[in-house]
A protein has these predicted regions:
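Conserved beta-strand scaffold positions in the cores of enzyme catalytic domains, especially
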Residues: 37, 57-59, 165
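A short helix->loop->beta-strand "cap" motif at the edges of active sites that frequently abuts
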Residues: 118-122
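Acidic/histidine-rich helix-loop elements
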Residues: 9-12, 54-67, 95, 188
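Short amphipathic alpha-helices and their capping/turn segments at secondary-structure boundaries
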Residues: 23-36, 71-79, 108-116
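Charged helix-capping and loop-helix junction motifs
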Residues: 100-110, 143-151
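Catalytic His-Asp segment of secreted/periplasmic serine-dependent ester chemistry enzymes
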Residues: 130-209
Length: 209
């Protein structure tokens, strides 16, 4: 068995928001031909189907979600055999002081697990975005290079684990500081409308391939 399919046992304690969101998703179907946006608040806080003008896009984001949280609810999504799944998760794991290689390999493990549930689904993994911890996020202070290291490992594993790595980081980073550019955020972590517009433009080639 592929060792990456085995869970990495990262911390996972579902809160009330997670449970409510999962219970909501239980009433929403995923079908063949659908495109699923899967992940944390960065996924959840966007009306993807409207922004990308595609009614087949389904939002399966949960604020505060982690790699193991996504893994826990993945079967309900993959059992619908969607056409494509775009994953954005990991920044909340970074805030839990977990080593970058552990987080990155947990994401790779998640992707292998998704493949095992629906082999024909095309999988895409976004790079983690830069952030600016000087706003409200003390738990992310000093962890800028953790994100860089995670992205490097993900990119290195894309071919061998049959997923497409979607580079976002360099498009969102301020070239002078390396932090999330002020044009795309008001809190140093989450995105404004301009940020999501940029993200959508970067996704277009993958939606049509």
């Amino acid at each position: 068995m592929n060792p990456y399919i085995e869970p990495c046992k990262l911390p996972f304690e579902p809160d009330d928001l997670y449970r409510r969101r999962v219970s909501h998703f239980a009433h929403l179907d995923v079908h063949g031909g659908d495109i699923v946006m899967l992940g944390d608040s960065l996924i959840n806080c966007c009306e993807w189907h409207e922004l990308l003008c595609n009614a087949h896009i389904k939002n399966r984001g949960i604020n505060g979600d982690t790699v193991e949280g996504v893994r826990y609810r993945a079967s309900a999504i993959m059992n619908g055999f969607p056409d494509k799944v775009f994953v954005m998760v990991g920044i909340n794991d970074v805030s839990h002081n977990i080593a970058p290689d552990v987080i990155a390999h947990a994401i790779v493990s998640l992707i292998d697990y998704l493949h095992s549930l629906s082999p024909a689904t095309r999988l895409y993994v976004h790079s983690l975005l830069p952030f600016d911890s000087s706003y409200h996020y003390a738990s992310l202070h000093g962890k800028e290079q953790t994100v860089v290291a995670i992205n490097t490992i993900l990119q290195e594993n894309a071919l061998s684990h049959n997923f497409t790595y979607v580079e976002l980081y360099r498009h969102f980073a301020d070239p002078s500081t390396g932090l999330l550019a002020l044009a795309y955020t008001t809190d140093g972590l989450h995105l404004t409308g301009s940020g999501y517009a940029l993200w959508a433009s970067l996704l277009q080639p993958y939606l049509t391939e």
